[in-house]
Amino acid sequence: MDDRLWEPQNPQKTRMWQFMQSVSQDQGQKFDSYQDLYHWSINNPESFWENICLFFNLGFDSQDYEILNKYPQMIDAQWFKGVHFNFAQKLLSRKDNHPALISINEHGEKQSLSYKELHHRVAQCIAGLKNLGITSGDRVAALMPNTAQTIIAMLASSALGAIWSSCSPDFGAEAALDRLGQLEPKILFCCDGHQYQGKKHSALDKISILHETISSLERVVICPNINEVLDISQLPKACYWNEFILPATECSFTALPFNHPLYVLFSSGTTGRPKCIMHGAGGTLIQHLK
């Protein structure tokens, strides 16, 4: 019985095949199958990850670095020591009119941003964050949906070396506090509300609770999502997105160590308070590329 579920019609046109040829040329070793490549990769992890970086042209080869340190235990392993780069800069390397982001709401309304437009909007958000004194190591949190605006805020935060974390806007205030409150964020991006099965749900009550409860907050930025007009007169730290961003055309990026924190994600919270899980910028980038 053939257990194969699927195979490409033209294997030699796949990115996997191209990577195999690249590794073969670099290593002087012929790979006849995926299994050959797999066994080589697990026996030569340093060479494998170095070849991933070369294949995707990350530019690390121009720096003096150690791929993997000599570690007594696995937990002590440190990758690409000496490499400095910026996660957002790698993602924003293009500035053309090719679509960069496409988001669609539940009504089927589509928003598309080109790389050029995305770069411009991230630059404006970076300027807004800089104006508030955000710098490397600060935490930036969000209660936002999967929209272009959320990605813009994330990229702007990582451009400065700030650490990003977010929750879905349909979380209750307590669930959001259990997660984001642990981080002591300086900035919180919140949508004005969310929509589910055609019904709009205002976020004002949740925003008010987070505004009052997270003492580390210096600014709460409210982003349009359902075009709800919120009364924020009693929230002195709150402002709207258009009040927060500043004029800018070029992004500024801070070069950071390979393992600099990028995201904080969370465990499910089913057996207790959600636990923070930190993901580094370098590992996230090359894993996504791979």
Pin down the residues of each PLM region.
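AMP-dependent adenylate-forming
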Residues: 23-29, 88-114, 224-232
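N-terminal amphipathic, basic-rich helices that act as targeting or association modules
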Residues: 1-75
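Conserved pre-ATP/AMP-binding loop-to-beta segment of ANL
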Residues: 97-99, 221-222, 233-266, 273, ...
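Hydrophobic alpha-helical segments in the ANL/AMP-binding
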Residues: 89-93, 130, 148-168, 175-177, ...
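A short N-terminal helical cap/helix-turn-helix that marks the beginning
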Residues: 42, 50-64, 81-102
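Conserved AMP-binding/adenylate-forming core of the ANL superfamily
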Residues: 36-40, 101-155, 172-177, 233-243, ...
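Conserved S/T- and glycine-rich ATP-binding loop of Class I adenylate-forming
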Residues: 140, 157, 261, 267-270
